[in-house]
């Protein structure tokens, strides 16, 4: 029996047509707790942008460490939230709203602009080339992850990712940037299901109704994810939930999934075959 590309992708990304928000929250908090204990780490660190995904992941992490502290009877575990703006963030109020919702144990702000600009300048001086705005956007994402790991190493923490199914299918993340993490608690959720979890957790409506943006490009500040993808999250979620969408949209999604497969794997070795099976 031939399995359709849609069914293959749904199974690979562990998506479900519907969820029970309370059960999903419990499942993901328990996952965070169990893996933290397995890794012998002391907590989690995550950058908070003010958007839906980092707000949800951050709140789940905070709840997980609070439960672990209660179970252990001591303050051995913590969650650190990072603000990592490139200069001045135009929607800083949203980031502060997210922090109020998450209530992290600690939060720090580090401006990544000097480090990013220094890396761009060194590249351009050393090569005589001009770094593209897109390449610089990836540099921002990778610098943020570098900062995450400085905190992780200092405090013995796990770096948390915010990748969910709608980003996974499109490869909409920077390799070794926001994709370079230790643990990914939102895996398998569609964008709409993430909103359901935030509503259940009592998040301010602004957090989950705000149009998503990676906001990495200098020349297109605040560019919406959906504009860059050329597909709405509603269409992507429908596909991931097993619903029928237009053949054009399905083909576009399946093509993006295949050409970004390398992003969903560790570095390829001579013994890997997944890349030959596309």
Please give the residue ranges for each predicted region.
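Short, basic, helix/turn surface patches
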Residues: 73, 133-143, 188-195, 231-243
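Alpha-helix boundary/capping residues
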Residues: 102, 122-126, 176, 201, ...
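Catalytic subdomain that performs nucleotidyl-dependent activation
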Residues: 75-78, 104, 136, 165-230
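Residues on a specific face of well-ordered alpha-helices
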Residues: 59, 93, 97, 146, ...
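Secondary-structure boundary/capping residues
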Residues: 70, 107, 206-207, 262
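Peripheral terminal appendages
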Residues: 1-46, 52, 56-60, 220-278
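ATP-dependent adenylation/nucleotidyltransferase module used to activate substrates
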Residues: 2-170
């Amino acid at each position: 029996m031939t399995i359709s590309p849609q069914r293959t992708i749904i199974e690979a990304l562990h998506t479900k047509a519907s969820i029970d928000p309370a059960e999903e929250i419990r499942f993901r908090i328990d996952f965070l707790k169990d893996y933290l204990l397995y890794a012998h780490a002391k907590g989690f660190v995550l950058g908070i942008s003010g958007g839906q995904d980092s707000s949800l992941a951050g709140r789940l992490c905070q709840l997980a460490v609070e439960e672990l502290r209660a179970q252990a009877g001591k303050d051995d575990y913590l969650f650190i939230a990072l603000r990592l703006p490139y200069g001045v963030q135009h929607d800083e109020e949203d980031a502060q709203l997210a922090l109020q919702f998450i209530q992290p144990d600690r939060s720090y702000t580090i401006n990544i602009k000097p480090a990013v600009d220094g890396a761009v300048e060194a590249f351009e001086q050393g090569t005589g080339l001009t770094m593209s705005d897109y390449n610089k956007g990836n540099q921002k994402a990778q610098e943020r992850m570098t900062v995450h790991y400085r905190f992780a190493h200092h405090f013995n923490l796990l770096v948390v990712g915010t990748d969910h199914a709608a980003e996974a299918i499109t490869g909409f993340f920077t390799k070794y940037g926001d994709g370079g993490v230790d643990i990914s608690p939102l895996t398998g959720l569609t964008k709409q299901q993430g909103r359901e979890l935030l509503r259940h957790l009592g998040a301010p409506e602004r957090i989950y109704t705000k149009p998503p943006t990676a906001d990495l490009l200098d020349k297109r500040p605040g560019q919406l994810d959906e504009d860059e993808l050329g597909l709405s999250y509603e269409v992507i979620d429908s596909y991931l939930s097993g619903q029928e969408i237009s053949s054009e949209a399905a083909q576009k999604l399946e093509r993006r999934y295949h050409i970004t497969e390398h992003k969903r794997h560790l570095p390829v070795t001579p013994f890997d075959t997944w890349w030959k099976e596309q």
